[in-house]
Amino acid sequence: MEASYKSESESEAWPGTQRPGTGTVSTAVREHLRKLCLREFPCGAGSWNKSRFLPQTWRTWRELVPKEEDVVSPGEETVEALLGLVRSPHSPWALLNDSNAEDSFLRELAIRNPLMITDTFFYSYFRSLRVVDKEVTLVDKDLLKFLKLEELVLSANRIKEVDATNLPPTLKVLELYGNEISSMECLCAHPPAGLQHLGLGHNKLLGPLESLYVTADHWPNLVSLDLGFNDLTDLQSMVASLRTLRHLRLLVLQGNPLALVPYYRGLTIDSLAQLCVLDDITVSPNEKHLFRGLSLNGDLLAQEAQFVVTIGNIRGVLDTSVLDPEPGPEGPFVAYSYYVTYDFVRDEEGEAVEDTGELAEIVKPSPSSELLVDESPEEVGEDVIKDIVGGVTEEVEGSLESEVEESGESELSVISGPSTVLQTPRASAEELAKLRLRIDPRLCPSPGTVLFNTTHKPWAEVIPCGYEMQHSLRDLVPLKAFLLAGTTVTIVEEKILSWPVVLPAVDSPLSAKRGKGEKDKKGKEKDRKGQGEKEPAKEWKVPKKKKELPKELRQDPPILQVLGRGLVILEPLLAGEPLVSTVCNFGMVRTLTSDRLTLARDSKKIKKVAKKEKPKAVNPIYESDYHPEPLTVEVQIQLNQCRSAEEALRMFAV
């Protein structure tokens, strides 16, 4: 039926559809109106409703006929039938799913009174325009034609700069969320005087100078301001500028580096007394009381963020030692230990790290570890080998054995092949260069980060790490990027092979001299007996137990194996959450066979318990009841936040 219909303006161009260029706001608006098909069936004027729009003189004679019913001409549709076509969700002319109530109103208006659909109508009708995710790059001057426009939403586009002279003076709401604007300076050239809301969240505003553009000189009537998730720094300068906005009631600053300092919320609330909502959280009277007076000393507060990283228990670790054969007298003697590593951002301005729990080890990225990122780590260049050799040589000359005993881990985390040992501290660089060092890329920190690890612990069903580390950072922009990326947590197994050292028997001059002295002593005693002299009484000595001297062992470089590795999302800390607490689950690594071997070993130990003690029964493991615990580790990262003005001044006053 509709195939026979023909639009009266089918051959005409849509008014105002000339496209001056792609990527403009006006082009996106026209494209949207074109998709509404306001001049095509069942909207607009055409053969389906042309009798309704005949000149009045042609219809006069019909009106003179008494009691004549209005009859639709053959081939035409009633208004109700046409409205049914656009309202029915099953109709091919139904609106698209992303359409709004305004689109529905325009289509019905184009059916009831299609002659109203003109450029003049559009420019005077629209009070709100929403152009979202349309690849818009330019706010063009055609927007000035919208005489009553009050709200302009241009979210999720690719706008880098806004010419404020192209904004209608009637504008009250300007939303530019999710664009690529790097400075507010372009908006301040000729801002709409009556603007009440400005949204610039998730853009690329950077640095402390942006505070110059949020004053009452540019936005005298601003009530709501969204600057969240940019790279704004210098909280003190920002709140000093915002203080001039007397009408400001709603403010969003979370997601910026300046919001990571512990006193951020308190200083902002005390500086902006008229503020009602900060970061979508209502400002309470109690908060205003707790932080009263903090703004008077705001310039004395250090601009740094503080995090506390806590690592709890490791569970579900495979006891690898039960898979090794019993060592013979010649070795090797195997020792296993387990620890957790995580990376944290490096502070270019000098990181202050405080260990508030057990001793924490820091593995700083060496030049070699940063370069070895290939999947085949055996392919090591000569330059890299030289760097590694240099670092190893320095460690060797500084008493290699004592370093290993104190730290429990060589600074270069290497995975060795066949056992290769540094026999003497004076090993030459040529010998060291022959070592085939293999560095696991998974144990190297990401660029711009430092690798931290817990102390090494022996195997247990539950391995308690007891780790707590405080990180204080002043370089806040890289810190924000790190929080967006997250930290990588790794569980590492360290295996060290030890071998007995066989010392060659060498006759020294000291031992020869000692032997000669004993021989002379025996000769004198013999002469004394021959002369009849009495032998002096020998002192009675208590027999002592023979002490077994500990065998001297040499150790191979540690063999490191990554048992589990995963990413911990830290973005909630940037979005205002004070704590991220999670249990990293790396799946099953234990097997029924390994657990049975562990059970058998433990049962042997129980049999050796003293006879007085009643041995505990060990339940056997059956395959039907076997439910191994997955490999997990507890991780918690907290962003420090001050709860009062007194606490902020005590902790951060310079």
From Swiss-Prot:
- Biased composition range(s): Basic and acidic residues: 515-542
Renumbered to this chain, region (Disordered) spans 1-25, 510-548
**LRR repeat residue intervals:** 148-168, 170-191, 194-213, 221-242
Q: Which SUPFAM superfamilies match?
A: L domain-like
Q: Which Gene3D superfamilies match?
A: Ribonuclease Inhibitor
Where does the LRRCT domain lie? 256-294
Q: Which InterPro entries match?
A: Cilia_flagella_integrity, Leu-rich_rpt, LRR_dom_sf
List keywords of the entry alphabetically: Leucine-rich repeat, Repeat
- Per the record, the domain of life is Eukaryota
PANTHER family, per this entry? LEUCINE-RICH REPEAT-CONTAINING PROTEIN 43, PROTEIN PHOSPHATASE 1 REGULATORY SUBUNIT SDS22-RELATED
This one is known as: Leucine-rich repeat-containing protein 43
Instruction: Record the organism.
Output: Macaca fascicularis
